[in-house]
Amino acid sequence: MAFWLAQERRSQESGFIQRFDPRFWTVDFPRPAMASAVTIGPDAIRVDVELHHEGELVGLIWESVDRFDHALLAYATDRDYSHTSLSFRWRSEGVIALDQPNGPTLTIEGRDEAGVSHTWYVRLWNYAEGSPTDAHITLAFSNLESGYTLPGTPVTPTDIDRMFISIVAPGHSGGSTVPLAERVNGHVVMSDIETGGARSMLDVGDVRLPVHGLRMATAYDDAYNQTPARLLRNIIGLGYRSDIVHYVGMSHFMRLERLGDGTLLADPSGTLCEPARAWHEAFLEQAGENDLEVIPSLSFELFDAYCPQEWKQRDAAGAPAFTGWVPPSTLLSPANMQAMGWLAEVARNIVGMLRAAGLQVRFQIGEPWWWVTSAGEICLYDDAAITALGGDLPNIGDLRKALDPASLDLLDRAGDLLAASTAGLAATVRDAAQGPAEILLLAFTPTILDPSMPEVHRANLPSGWAWPAFERLQIEDYDWLIEGADALRREAFNFVDTKLGYSLVEQDYFAGFVLDAEDAEDFWPRIDRGIDEVSARGVERLYVWALPQVTRDGYTRLPSTGKSDMQSFDDVLYPFALGRSSAVAPEFSTSISVTASGHERRNALWSNARMHFDVGPGIRSETELAELIAFFRARHGPARGFRISDPFDHSSAGMTGVPTALDQLLGTGDGVRADFQLMKSYGPGPEQQVRPITRPRGDSLLVSVGGVQTGDWTLGPLGVISLGSAPAEGAEVRAGFLFDVPVRFAEDRIDIAGINFAAGEAPSIPLIELREAG
């Protein structure tokens, strides 16, 4: 399907927003503080904070450059705030008041009149009218002064990068890690936000792309700093509909409680921290208002610093399971009843919010597994797991090695334990729903079906997950997808189908994921192609993971328009053999310029020749002439393509020879890639022309890998060979074949005069080669 990576807005729809629109503020803060911002009206925003240490500071941020919205929806960059004013009503509770030392301050980062980086600190109380907790504030940027008291240092308003308002706890001490006497929960409401002056409005992208059938996935850990309204604006504007899979994350949603030694750990009650609760309530409510369902997702992953030691999965040496994130997260043991109880209570709280928002209860259990380290060690040796699995467990030191029966049995029992834990979580969700509930399970196949560890599926894709354990099974394989490991993907699809038994209509697919922006140009085409491939399998619910990468890279999906008549192709052969009287003409397009010295400069505009045929001279009788006219009418003239056999070039062996499996080099194995385009090379050396072959004769095709002919392949559309397994690194993939040329009639009519034909005059019936993706 068509897509592009939009880097800027050109002629797309745009509009205007008021500068300082509440939807576009963000928050940020250091761990373990928590904060969120939600819009509570067209001119109002509320910030909730949960603070644990004297030095923690939450910033409510406005940036001159839009770093978070998709290019087609972003607001314009404008660093000049001169002659602009911002006014609002400030109300606060539980946080330090406006009139106090360290009270709310507008920190402005930019450059002074000399262009030197500078930071100004504008005390809001100096511009407030009212009480320290309920005041009206007006900030005229051309007249602002930095400092605790006025007069102060004038602010240069013409080159500002960003500004933020500080929100801290009473008793704040900058940089201090001393715990507060008790957790501080507070909030700030900025309402009646109004911008005036000469630069009070910003140009903003305002596209509403056609609905394309894909759905969106996002995560609170990626979006905690943005307002729910901003996320939903991007999702809807980019054409995503139906529902959103929303991962509640592993680091920002939980309430933390302090132990006697000062350590902050996840509250075993499963309570969400107040900022996360407020954010999710707003997100669910606003999604429902936009006819979007939300599928919350909860995983077994938890930020390591917040996880009690006894909850963690561990390897045989007792080391905790650590993911690759920095700082790391860990995995909860399915055997630990406290850990599973915490997950269950979190789920119960989330379901309660779904019901309060009037949304259907749909809930994803995301990627539950026993962690496997990079050394192949499986982490099922925590104390609770050892007890649950019977004690005195065999040490599975490396899943990449052959395993004895006792180890295989242990993996099976670990799988049963994992299945029991997910069944328990599902039961909690169903109970909390107090009515119908749809439970979905997400499985990440590159890990649980890693071919270097062929038995790990026993533990991490247990038979206890087989249908109908869950209403829907969701598959994610982004490691393989972005690597181009198509054979592994296909094998995994088939394995999962066989083992778990979910029909294709009961399966969903997650496509992604571009971690680094520099990989966008390479990875998004593979992701988009993978979406189409899975759709062709019959999977209807397709999700893009995840929104931050979509907006960062400008991924823009367009709906399918169906087959255009002008692009249609009838896979039929031209009904007459081309005789020697037929004309065949390869054509290139070349730009030739002559310099003042008389020398030519030549530039080939096409990498491949385009073939022209004149088949009129091959018509030998009035019967054939009648057939030709019928064939022309059936193709609607040049509207529909068809095959033709080139009498002078139709084989991989030379031009017309008998094919062998070694004729044409398609590529070299890398241990990952399994799909190869049929090609034919012309000429020797590095300057040879390589011609994609999109219309091979399937019954003539021969394939070899590493010089050995193989039958383990399938022929896909447009001449793509899919091998059953990826060729080893360095192995040559070759093929031999006969092929036809895709063509169309070159003109809208054919002129044939019966008297001329009877007199032996051949008509002219030109054909032109079609360029097909290949």
Role assignments for model-derived ranges:
Residues 216-222, 262-274, 327-343, 408-418, ...:
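The substrate-binding groove and active-site-proximal loops of carbohydrate-active enzymes
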Residues 86-88, 136-187, 193:
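Extracellular beta-strand ligand-recognition surfaces/modules
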Residues 213-215, 219-262, 282, 286, ...:
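Catalytic domains of carbohydrate-active enzymes, especially glycoside hydrolases
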